[in-house]
Amino acid sequence: MVDKRQLLGMTLEELKGVASEVGLPAYAAKQMADWIYKKKITRISEMTNIAVAKRALLEDSFEIGAYPPSEYQKSKDGTIKYLYAAGPGRFVESVYIPTDDRATLCVSSQVGCKMNCLFCMTGKQGFTANLTANQILNQIQSLPENDSLTNIVFMGMGEPLDNVDELFKVLEILTAPYGYAWSPKRITVSTIGVTKGLKRFLEESECHLAVSLHSPYPMERLSLMPVEKAFPAREVIDLIKQYDFSHQRRVSFEYIVFKNLNDSLKHAEALSCLLGGIPCRVNLIRFHAIPNVSLETSDIAKMEAFRDFLNAKGVVCTIRASRGEDIFAACGMLSTAKNVTFV
């Protein structure tokens, strides 16, 4: 049996290639895109404006490639964590986060992660594979709450800019008129600062950027994030300063606050100096305890003092509300290591 190729995750140019393969005119690519991304069909047979014989040819080699989540967990705060298969013995998690005025989906880009951040369960899992554009988009398209989505954040499992080619295909489909036609303002890509991918993102994308920072001091950041050695925060920030964030595109810096480690006003002062000249936001995030890691979260009074100091210095700073901690869906808690036995 020949493995079929998935149409979900193909760009318009790729769909033109599919049309050519089965003897359809080039304009049929737009018809297929409408069916896949706007009508969200799950079977090629539903493409009723394409001739039956041509649909049969398509079905010989292709499938839509949309598949429902394998399981889910719902938090007491309404957050829902979904598990998706991503190949034999491989799984990823995504998180649906509804609030009063928006509904955000936190999407994964890799099975596991190479970055091995001290505070992150995904990093403890290690890296298995990059997700394909199909596997990334399926988390969005097959979400039961898809119609309610207002925002997408690439802050799930993996480092998005370490899977940059598939990421850019997904961003194109999400924002292009032939695809979802979303505004880039509704999409945020998070990164630890993979330089090559970041440069491409800054040059080619209008989506928002979030940078995992967590300390203004190189050696301290290195103790938390081994990637500081390859991608120093100072170099990442110097690169960002070369681009314009004064209009619709935003940059934010993510800062998990650890007790007696990076929560002092000295840190806040150093952070304000490091970020000087960038119109940005700092998001303070409570550390969510994970197994075999001795770090603790800072107390709320210290976080509020840190926030107030930065705001007084002209750096917009907020404390992000934690969601889904009781189901291990909060920041730094995603992991599918436990699922690999269920093949």
Curated annotation (Swiss-Prot):
Entry keywords, A to Z: 4Fe-4S, Cytoplasm, Disulfide bond, Iron, Iron-sulfur, Metal-binding, Methyltransferase, rRNA processing, S-adenosyl-L-methionine, Transferase, tRNA processing
Annotated [4Fe-4S] cluster binding sites: 113, 117, 120
Example of a GO MF term: tRNA (adenine(37)-C2)-methyltransferase activity
CDD domains hit by this protein: Radical_SAM (cd01335)
Active site: 93, 331
GO cellular component terms listed in the entry, alphabetical order: cytoplasm
Enzyme class: transferase
E.C. number: 2.1.1.192
Domain of life: Bacteria
Radical SAM core domain ranges (all copies): 99-320
GO biological process: rRNA base methylation; tRNA methylation
S-S bridge residues: 106-331
InterPro entries: Aldolase_TIM, Methyltransferase_A, RlmN_N, RNA_MTrfase_RlmN, rRNA_lsu_MTrfase_RlmN/Cfr, rSAM
Cofactor note: Binds 1 [4Fe-4S] cluster. The cluster is coordinated with 3 cysteines and an exchangeable S-adenosyl-L-methionine.
Cross-referenced Gene3D superfamilies: 1.10.150.530, Aldolase class I
Cofactor needs: [4Fe-4S] cluster
Family membership: Belongs to the radical SAM superfamily. RlmN family.
Additional information: Reaction proceeds by a ping-pong mechanism involving intermediate methylation of a conserved cysteine residue.
Annotated PANTHER family: 23S RRNA METHYLTRANSFERASE, RADICAL SAM CORE DOMAIN-CONTAINING PROTEIN
Function: Specifically methylates position 2 of adenine 2503 in 23S rRNA and position 2 of adenine 37 in tRNAs.
The protein, known as: Probable dual-specificity RNA methyltransferase RlmN
Organism from which the protein derives: Parabacteroides distasonis (strain ATCC 8503 / DSM 20701 / CIP 104284 / JCM 5825 / NCTC 11152)
Record gene name: rlmN
